[in-house]
């Protein structure tokens, strides 16, 4: 594993407290509000003309939950993140044509959301561990691109 035992403990301890639906919806909504041009990937999700549309779009909330649940799978596979995300990397590259830079952006937003939802537990050490995790997830999702 690229993570120390201490980093793994920090990640697992915080992740056990995460509300995936709330944090996932928040993270994806933030991505689409901060970077509105990213909405083009989700045009089939319906109305997203305004930030309020994004915040109240059930499909965005559901997909955010799905995305964060997938991120949570990385937590369960800290020793093989790349192998675990091989299929998703291929899918996002071949079918969805998602710019792999989005994986880094969303990873950073997930970290912000986790910090907001868990301010007490989100110490600098925990932040560093999750930053490392987000980097590994983004790299794993980008494998097919290079």
Swiss-Prot record:
PROSITE patterns linked to this entry: GLOBIN
Pfam families: Globin
UniProt entry tagged with the keyword DNA damage: no
Keyword annotations from UniProtKB, A to Z: Heme, Iron, Metal-binding, Oxygen transport, Transport
GO biological process annotation, one example: hydrogen peroxide catabolic process
Positions annotated to bind heme b: 63, 92
Annotated ranges, domain Globin: 2-146
Domain of life: Eukaryota
Keyword presence, Transport: yes
One term under GO cellular component: blood microparticle
MF term (GO), any: oxygen binding
CDD domains associated with the record: Hb-beta-like
Tissues expressed in: Red blood cells.
Miscellaneous information on this protein: Displays a pronounced Bohr effect despite the lack of the His at position 146 conserved in the beta subunit in most other vertebrates. Shows chloride-dependent sensitivity to organophosphates like ATP and 2,3-diphosphoglycerate (DPG) but not to inositol hexaphosphate (IHP). Binds molecular CO(2), not bicarbonate as reported for other crocodilians.
Entry similarity comment: Belongs to the globin family.
Subunit field text: Heterotetramer of two alpha chains and two beta chains. When oxygenated in vitro, exists virtually only in polymeric form. When deoxygenated, forms tetramers, octamers and larger polymers.
Function: Involved in oxygen transport from the lung to the various peripheral tissues.
Name of this protein: Hemoglobin subunit beta
Phylogenetic placement of the source organism: Eukaryota, Metazoa, Chordata, Craniata, Vertebrata
